[in-house]
């Protein structure tokens, strides 16, 4: 194994396509800023955050008055910072282990949050469970470190407006961290009466992305962590967790988890084999416990009522 790792470290690194990374980042900044501008306008006017029928008219207003985009930057910069921290966590873990990897690719999209997220491309094999664990866990932890203060700042700038959370076309669930932080900052205020500031909404999206990535399934970050601990039992355990995810969707009535579980099962749950099957060690077990806590704090059985996607 040492000779294989030496060969990997001596192989020339792939060239980064800086222009493509920069272009995708700028486009994603634009799409998320447009979304943020709408969120800010609705927040200022005490209108529900998402009114689907109002989208086209607002986009025309931005076309006529581009300065409206400035108000969307708090949302977009917060969201992109969380996503960037997550992907750089993976990237730096790869760098530490001399694994060739790309810089983050951002994905602009005409969705309710303006993006499909971001990813890095790992261009070299991962040889050991320790490496796999480090690469898998670094992203969610790095993103969570940025997410927590963003959530605090966003909640501090949120406001109480009776019944606002139940109005509009979409109703958002409360992950455990958001619920606890709300009780701390707004004691006695019902969740339905709290109007989240756009920064808090960006943190909410970060929580959902973190929860999804940490699911112990397939080749998600949580799936990498699962393989690092259980090796060749990974596929069977992934199948079990995918079925559990579908069951959560059935029990709580959210089609999204059922669709995600079906997607995971349909695309296959195999994981590339690892050469070095040595245990990850006690220290990494503690880090895995931290990742499990982050998953518990980020997950919500019904992320969005009224939609199965963002």
Residue ranges and their predicted role:
Residues 1-310:
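Hydrophobic transmembrane alpha-helices and their immediate loop junctions
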């Amino acid at each position: 194994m040492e000779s294989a790792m030496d060969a990997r470290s001596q192989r020339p690194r792939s060239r980064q396509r800086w222009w493509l990374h920069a272009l995708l980042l700028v486009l994603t900044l634009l799409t998320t800023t447009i979304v943020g501008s709408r969120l800010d306008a609705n927040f200022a006017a005490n209108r529900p955050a998402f009114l689907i029928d109002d989208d086209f008219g607002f986009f025309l207003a931005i076309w006529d008055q581009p300065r409206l985009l400035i108000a969307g930057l708090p949302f977009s910069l917060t969201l992109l910072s969380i996503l960037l921290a997550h992907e750089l966590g993976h990237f730096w873990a790869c760098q530490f282990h001399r694994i060739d990897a790309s810089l983050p690719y951002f994905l602009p999209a005409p969705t309710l949050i303006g993006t499909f997220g971001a990813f890095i491309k790992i261009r070299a094999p991962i040889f050991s469970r320790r490496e796999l664990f480090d690469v898998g866990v670094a992203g969610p932890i790095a993103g969570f470190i940025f997410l927590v203060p963003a959530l605090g700042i966003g909640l501090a700038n949120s406001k109480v407006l009776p019944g606002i959370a139940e109005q509009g076309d979409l109703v958002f669930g409360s992950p455990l961290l958001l619920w606890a932080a709300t009780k701390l900052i707004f004691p006695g205020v019902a969740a339905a009466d709290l109007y989240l500031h756009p920064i808090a909404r960006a943190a909410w999206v970060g929580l959902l992305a973190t929860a999804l990535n940490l699911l112990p399934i397939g080749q998600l970050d949580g799936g990498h962590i699962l393989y690092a601990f259980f090796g060749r039992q990974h596929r069977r355990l992934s199948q079990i967790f995918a079925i559990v995810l579908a069951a959560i969707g059935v029990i709580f009535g959210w089609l999204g988890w059922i669709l995600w579980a079906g997607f995971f099962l349909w695309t296959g749950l195999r994981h590339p084999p690892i050469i070095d099957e040595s245990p990850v060690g006690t220290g990494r077990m503690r880090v895995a416990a931290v990742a499990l806590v982050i998953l518990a704090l980020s997950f919500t059985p019904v992320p969005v009522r009224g939609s199965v996607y963002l």
